[in-house]
Amino acid sequence: MSSSAPITEKAKNDRALRFYRDALGLERLHYGMWLPDDELTMEALKAAQKRYEDFLIDSIPEGTRRVLDVGCGTGELCLHLKAQGYEVEGLSPDINQKKVFAEKVEALFHFTKFEDSQLEGGYDLIIMSESCQYIPLDKVFEVAQQALNPKGYLMVCDYFVLDQNAGELSKSGHDYNEFLKEAEESAFEIVSRRDITPDIRKTLEIADDWAEKILLGADILTEKFRERNPFLWKIVKWFGLSKYEKALSQKVLIDADKFCAVKKYEFILFQLQP
């Protein structure tokens, strides 16, 4: 089942979704909540992602019935919410997420951006798990208010920027103080919150570990070519320099120490006030 509002821009194509599912075998796209003694393995990552999902579900207020998952990814959260008796709907402007959701979850899907959505309303809870950062800040609470029942809830679990002068790390995520200011000026109040930055840290550590191994592997694989064809290697480097430099500049995004110094990953549950 599908519903949609007009999409003025080309539908997004989430290549990360395809990579995580098809290449890595991951059913979830979000960070994980790790235990202190967890090793950096694929199985531990999957368990951490499931723990994150369970944390969200356990945090749902009593009396909640109808739930909208904004940026529903692979549909795993909706699938488990439905199994627990909730009436769920998904929302995303991404064509791949739409396809995966249709294959996995028998529920209504809204093929649109949240800020452009024409929702009928009546939701008890809206969940934004790592999707709030993609929604214009001035639209987050405005559209949520229109879509929720009186005294409905907005659950945000995402990372925010603490330092706007931190280069690449400052480019993704809402400014933390601006987000809280926007919330304070809205019709919502915070009813619970938790800083989970320490819990998600190992997600970055395992990503950085994989990146190092990939770079080392690429170096080893090209070693003989570089030795035997130095001139051709210079040409290859020249053509691929911009992509290589971009990859290096973006590697900082998975540096756990720098991430935790510049960003804050927080769970915040808001309630709409009369």
Each predicted region: which residue ranges?
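A short glycine-rich, Lys/Arg-flanked "PGG" loop and its adjoining helix->strand segment in the class I
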Residues: 139-153
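Class I SAM-dependent methyltransferase SAM/SAH-binding core
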Residues: 68-116
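A short acidic, Gly/Pro-enriched loop at the edge of an enzyme's catalytic core
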Residues: 117-126
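N-terminal, positively charged/glycine-rich alpha-helical extensions of SAM-dependent methyltransferases
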Residues: 1-36
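Conserved alpha-helix/loop element of class I SAM-dependent methyltransferases that forms part
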Residues: 46-63
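A short SAM/SAH-binding and catalytic strip from SAM-dependent methyltransferases
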Residues: 125-137
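Substrate-binding/catalytic lobe of Class I Rossmann-like enzymes that use SAM or dcSAM, i.e.
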Residues: 167-257
